[in-house]
């Protein structure tokens, strides 16, 4: 009987440890964006990557329904949100036009592709990145900007959503 009780306790401990590990597995909320110039197209390319769970939770919270990001109508909802929360501005303060190229979704991440057609990356003066910070107060977004052969990294969060690149 003692052996059986011991085994039950071990199994219960293992289950609880696993549940605790799963709960702690997603204790941070982060996104990463890469901005670079494509010499072949003459456009500045923007690639965002976010945790799929965070994007799904955001959309579900905003619209009180399930989202399927393989559905073009649901993609349009995400597009509208991202275009409101992320933008680039020129030296005169005007926003640079960002064209939505598309997105890729897998179990772990949502990758969003945008571009500023016929716009060199050195036209970017200001980056505004508030994606997910309105929903997740601890969201941290990192933007890597490659310009003139050098890489610069900028950090954004609920307290800092806009930075000059110079």
Could you describe each region identified by the protein language model?
Residues 18-20:
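N-terminal signal peptide c-region/cleavage motif recognized by signal peptidases
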Residues 1-14:
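Bacterial N-terminal signal peptides that target proteins for export
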Residues 24-166:
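N-terminal soluble domains immediately following signal/targeting peptides that reside
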Residues 7, 22-24:
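Intrinsically disordered, low-complexity peptide-like regions
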């Amino acid at each position: 009987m003692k052996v059986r009780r011991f085994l039950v306790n071990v199994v219960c401990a293992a289950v609880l440890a696993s549940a605790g590990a799963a709960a702690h597995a997603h204790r941070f909320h982060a996104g990463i964006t890469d901005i670079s110039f494509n010499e072949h197209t003459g456009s500045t390319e923007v690639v965002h990557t976010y945790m799929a769970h965070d994007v799904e939770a955001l959309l579900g919270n905003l619209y009180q329904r399930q989202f399927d990001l393989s559905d073009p109508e649901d993609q349009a909802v995400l597009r509208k949100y991202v275009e409101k929360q992320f933008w680039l501005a020129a030296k005169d303060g005007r926003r640079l036009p960002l064209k939505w190229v598309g997105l890729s979704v897998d179990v772990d991440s949502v990758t969003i592709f945008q571009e500023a057609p016929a716009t060199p990356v050195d036209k970017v003066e200001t980056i505004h990145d508030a994606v997910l910070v309105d929903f997740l107060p601890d969201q941290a977004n990192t933007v890597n900007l490659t310009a003139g052969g050098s890489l610069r990294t900028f950090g954004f969060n609920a307290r800092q959503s806009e930075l000059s690149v110079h």
